[in-house]
């Protein structure tokens, strides 16, 4: 997270960290949506990874920290055919449920769609310098704004983004506040509702007029609820 500060230890009980089993490198975030399921970005998938819940400092563990591995992973269309503007979403079923504790609690899915102009909070253990690989020990948090989708389309002509998309655009037009490498998969929380999953942005991060894109959770609710209910062949929104 660029331009933020250390998150309050009590404000991110739903935030999970994905890290490689071998090198213990933290590579993505995610959001606990109930005792057994985590929502993150499809591009965060790896062969072997673990999920750390209830974590704040990487060096000093919380007493209620928990580790899980994926029992099942679900992708929209049950394939990995996500593109920059579509289907960058993955549902992970944990190998065993977690109980709520001091630093662990799920975040409910959104009850209404987000509105442009909302203030949104982003969080994660990703880079805190736009260009250097400086990673913090604790998660950083910052507020950004939900922008018109066109504001993510115009600055990136090379991506040939479609006119409409199940993607949210969020950032600060003057730059300086943004998600960055390592924050992918983490939540975008607008007006207190979980509305987006960090998907992609510019490199270097936080440049003026180069906001980032977030997968729109609201558009995928039916798919999410179906998968959790056991309808594993549920189709993704077209």
Swiss-Prot record:
Single biological process term from Gene Ontology: proteolysis
Pfam families: Trypsin
GO CC annotation: extracellular region; secretory granule
Places the protein is found: Secreted
UniProt GO MF annotations: serine-type endopeptidase activity; toxin activity
Post-translational modification: N-glycosylated at Asn-81 by a disaccharide composed of two N-acetylglucosamine (NAG). The presence of this N-glycan deforms the enzyme and Removing the carbohydrate moiety increases the esterase activity, but induces a complete loss of contractile response on mouse thoracic aorta.
Entry EC number(s): 3.4.21.-
Coiled coil: none
Glycosylation sites: 81
Reported regulation of activity: Inhibited by PMSF, L-cysteine and partially by SBTI and leupeptin.
Major enzyme class: hydrolase
Tissue: Expressed by the venom gland.
UniProt keyword list: Disulfide bond, Fibrinogenolytic toxin, Glycoprotein, Hemostasis impairing toxin, Hydrolase, Protease, Secreted, Serine protease, Toxin
Domain Peptidase S1 intervals: 1-229
Active site, renumbered: 43, 88, 184
Annotated disulfide bonds: 7-141, 28-44, 76-236, 120-190, 152-169, 180-205
Superkingdom field: Eukaryota
Further comment: Negative results: does not have effect on potassium channels and L-type calcium channels in vascular smooth muscle cells.
Family per record: Belongs to the peptidase S1 family. Snake venom subfamily.
Quaternary structure, from the entry: Monomer.
Role according to the record: Thrombin-like enzyme that shows fibrinogenolytic activity against both the Aalpha (FGA) and Bbeta (FGB) chains of bovine fibrinogen. This enzyme has poor esterolytic activity upon BAEE substrate. It induces mouse thoracic aortic ring contraction with EC(50)=147 nmol/L. It shows vasoconstrictor effects that are independent of the enzymatic activity, but related to the release of calcium ions form the calcium store, potentially through the activation of ryanodine receptors.
PANTHER family recorded: KALLIKREIN-1, KALLIKREIN-RELATED
Name of the protein in question: Thrombin-like enzyme AhV_TL-I
């Amino acid at each position: 997270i660029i331009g933020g500060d250390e998150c309050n230890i009590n404000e991110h009980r739903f935030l999970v960290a994905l890290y490689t089993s071998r090198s213990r490198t933290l590579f993505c975030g995610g959001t606990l949506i109930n005792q057994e399921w985590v929502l993150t970005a499809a591009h965060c998938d790896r062969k072997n990874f673990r999920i750390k819940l209830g974590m704040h400092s990487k060096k000093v563990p919380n007493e209620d920290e928990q580790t899980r591995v994926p029992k099942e992973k679900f992708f929209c269309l049950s394939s990995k055919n996500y593109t920059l503007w579509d289907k960058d979403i993955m549902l992970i079923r944990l190998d065993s449920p977690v109980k709520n504790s001091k630093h662990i609690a799920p975040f409910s899915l959104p009850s209404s769609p987000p509105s442009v102009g909302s203030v949104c909070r982003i969080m994660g253990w990703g880079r805190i310098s736009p260009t250097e690989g400086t990673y913090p020990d604790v998660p950083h948090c910052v507020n950004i704004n939900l922008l018109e989708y066109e504001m993510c389309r115009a600055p990136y002509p090379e991506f040939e983004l479609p006119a409409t998309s199940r993607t949210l655009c969020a950032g600060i037009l003057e730059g300086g506040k943004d998600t960055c490498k390592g924050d992918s998969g983490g939540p975008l929380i607008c007006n207190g509702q979980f509305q987006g999953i960090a998907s992609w942005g510019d490199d270097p991060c936080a440049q003026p007029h180069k906001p980032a894109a977030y997968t729109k959770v609201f558009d995928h609710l039916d798919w999410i609820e179906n998968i959790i209910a056991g309808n594993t062949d549920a189709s993704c929104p077209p």
